Amino acid sequence: MSRYTGPKWRISRRLGVSLSGTGKELSRRAYAPGDHGAGRRAKISEYGMQLREKQKLRFTYGLTERQFHALFNKAGKIRKGTHGTNFMILLEQRLDSLVYRLGFATTRQQARQLVNHGHIMVDGKRVDIPSYNVTPGQVVSVRDKSKNIVPIQAAVESVVARPQFVSFDAEKLEGSLVRLPEREELDADLNEALIVEYYNRLG
């Protein structure tokens, strides 16, 4: 299954989550496309809630269904912790997620493009694989030749705060994952247990 490239504002409204990270999609019309007001939304089944929660997380991180499901299965093999929490941690360990969290990009989509185009390094070596798994202690940086790129500079300057599980050096334009994130540091509006139920239901 290919990555969705259609109108993200429409998907944001349907799922009730801002995929751009700005919240603009929901500021004018918080109800789903096709509805004519917040009070008209139809009741949703248990399966529908599970599917919607899965789609919210998948679209937020911009993964294909195959990538998303593969990472979910990988999380299920981790013995310590819960399946859902481990899944969310693995999503945060993706290189494109760290690039976004460090503030090199204003959106995860932009972060993925920076990685794909070879602007990002891990421990001094260029890595152009967005799904690369970053482990605590590894240093993520911008290539010297890319440090003056306007979108990167603008993104770094716009950051108000970074999560506590990363460190950042503004002068060197580099940072690291100092530790794995705690569940409470991640999206509070998402119920990952519903995603576990969704895939368990499929068998």
From Swiss-Prot:
Gene Ontology BP annotations: ribosomal small subunit biogenesis; translation
Highest taxon above the source species: Bacteria
Location of the S4 RNA-binding domain: 93-153
The keyword Cytoplasm appears for this protein: no
Keyword RNA-binding: yes
InterPro entries on file: Ribosomal_uS4, Ribosomal_uS4_bac-type, Ribosomal_uS4_CS, Ribosomal_uS4_N, S4_RNA-bd, S4_RNA-bd_sf
Record's GO cellular component terms: small ribosomal subunit
Alphabetical keyword list: Ribonucleoprotein, Ribosomal protein, RNA-binding, rRNA-binding
Assembly and oligomerization: Part of the 30S ribosomal subunit. Contacts protein S5. The interaction surface between S4 and S5 is involved in control of translational fidelity.
Protein name in UniProt: Small ribosomal subunit protein uS4
